């Protein structure tokens, strides 16, 4: 049967502003979202046996309808009206519940792959519409570019001028619930109205916009996040920030040599998940 293997990249947030709580329980956000080359691997195979099947083998990642990748494939099957089966094998390299968007990226990759395998011809815009019904970050991964994300994350504007930075990703091997972080967030007032530039020429420009309104919530419960930020800066990072709802922290570096040296230094003195990666631009 026809099969396709694709990479599903993680993301970091160079910026995450929580603007206000919405009547529907979600929050209006303003984010700068950047894909990185830490990737899960997704193999999608068409099958004679109807229905969707997901296998992963990673603790904490469900295989059935609770898996967002399963729901992505099922949504496109329902749209297509076809009776074919879809088998999805996920090799997880992105830490789970880490603020890196691994599940959302898997779902977006399944949308793109199933659309291609079944020859549905759905546009990126239509796939993004399907994606937002699955999760707020899914449209960004379908979009496939560095972006300013607004609304709940589904209103996307491409940021084309981004330097090819290197990052060191550090995860303390603690899962954090995104729902808990947002429930614990204490909004102090309306957004102050500052603007975000759309052009970044170097690492200093990116460091100038680093901010995450969720960081104080997560760091209060998991102080190790603050320790990781300090370790990254001490290892030479131009800036460091928690990604998404955490607990993963990233440090920004201007060169591969600096990033790999810092990653090795932190790996040698901790039992954390540490990796040097490129920003995908």
UniProtKB/Swiss-Prot annotation:
Q: Which reaction does it catalyse?
A: 4-CDP-2-C-methyl-D-erythritol + ATP = 4-CDP-2-C-methyl-D-erythritol 2-phosphate + ADP + H(+)
Determine the domain of life of the protein's source.
Answer: Bacteria
Q: Where, by residue number, is the active site?
A: 11, 137
Tell me a GO biological process for this protein. Answer: terpenoid biosynthetic process
Its EC number is: 2.7.1.148
SUPFAM superfamilies annotated for this entry? GHMP Kinase, C-terminal domain, Ribosomal protein S5 domain 2-like
Q: What class of enzyme is it?
A: transferase
Q: Which UniProt keywords apply?
A: ATP-binding, Isoprene biosynthesis, Kinase, Nucleotide-binding, Transferase
TM region positions = none
* InterPro entries noted in UniProt: GHMP_kinase_C_dom, GHMP_kinase_C_sf, GHMP_kinase_N_dom, IspE, Ribosomal_Su5_D2-typ_SF, Ribsml_uS5_D2-typ_fold_subgr
* Pathway assigned in UniProt: Isoprenoid biosynthesis; isopentenyl diphosphate biosynthesis via DXP pathway; isopentenyl diphosphate from 1-deoxy-D-xylulose 5-phosphate: step 3/6
Cite the binding residues for ATP.
95-105
Q: Which GO terms describe its molecular function?
A: 4-(cytidine 5'-diphospho)-2-C-methyl-D-erythritol kinase activity; ATP binding
HAMAP family recorded: IspE
Q: What does this protein do?
A: Catalyzes the phosphorylation of the position 2 hydroxy group of 4-diphosphocytidyl-2C-methyl-D-erythritol.
Similarity comment: Belongs to the GHMP kinase family. IspE subfamily.
The entry's protein name is 4-diphosphocytidyl-2-C-methyl-D-erythritol kinase
Q: Which gene encodes it?
A: ispE
